[in-house]
From Swiss-Prot:
Residues 80-175 form the Toprim domain. The keyword Zinc-finger applies. May play a role in DNA repair. It seems to be involved in an RecBC-independent recombinational process of DNA repair. It may act with RecF and RecO. This is Recombination protein RecR. Belongs to the RecR family. It comes from Streptococcus equi subsp. zooepidemicus (strain MGCS10565). Keywords: DNA damage, DNA recombination, DNA repair, Metal-binding, Zinc, Zinc-finger. One of its GO terms (molecular function) is zinc ion binding.
Length: 198
């Protein structure tokens, strides 16, 4: 069905979001049209504010409104461990369990040979620089249990072990193919406690 151009453009915009197909995008577009002008303005303002006011921490790569982020500036955290994750949402998931007290490093992606993504395409160089200049003695790789997550973990292990840095991986309480973001807190806690060396 053909929609008026403004609705069609809104549907197209919603369709660009991950996990949103045309049907859901259409529902969201029509819901948005039915919202009050005040709610639509607030929604638009919040979108723009998030885009303008957020940045990536210059140390760990986490999404933040202050640079460096509040985690990197917290001197009470364990300086000996850095937990490496794919995305900022994974930092939030790990922080919820309140059991990991070290620092983080966000890769902003995974090595994916099938998709043409190599080590230079993700935030790895700054991790190496950080490790060579800092006090960390262990890197915990917390990438998802997928082929790309495993490839990334093995690459990190291969480049860091010769430098004498202990590289561990979250234990397998996480199902293969699962996302850390959706794991419950007990599963994440067990995965950290029972991590294995790579």
């Amino acid at each position: 069905m053909l929609y008026p151009i403004p609705i069609a453009k809104l549907i197209e915009s919603y369709s660009k979001l991950p996990g949103i197909g045309v049907k859901t995008a259409t529902r969201l577009a029509f819901y948005t049209i039915g919202m009050s002008d005040e709610d639509v303005n607030d929604f638009a303002k919040n979108l723009l504010a998030a885009k303008r006011e957020l940045t990536y921490c210059s140390i760990c790569g986490n999404l933040t409104d202050d640079d460096p982020c509040h985690i990197c500036t917290d001197s009470s955290r364990d300086k000996e461990t850095i937990l490496v994750v794919e995305a900022s949402k994974d930092v939030s998931a790990m922080e919820k369990i309140q059991e990991y007290h070290g620092y983080y490093h966000v890769l902003h992606g995974l090595i994916s040979p099938m998709n043409g993504v190599g080590p230079d395409d993700i935030n790895l160089k700054s991790l190496i620089t950080r490790l060579m200049a800092g006090e960390a003695t262990e890197v915990i790789v917390a990438t998802n249990a997928t082929a790309d997550g495993e490839a990334t973990a093995m690459y990190i292990s291969r480049i860091l072990k010769p430098a004498g840095i202990k590289v561990t991986r979250l234990a397998r309480g996480l199902a293969v193919g699962s996302d850390i973001e959706y794991a419950d807190e007990v599963t994440l806690l067990r995965a950290i406690e029972n991590r294995t060396e790579l």
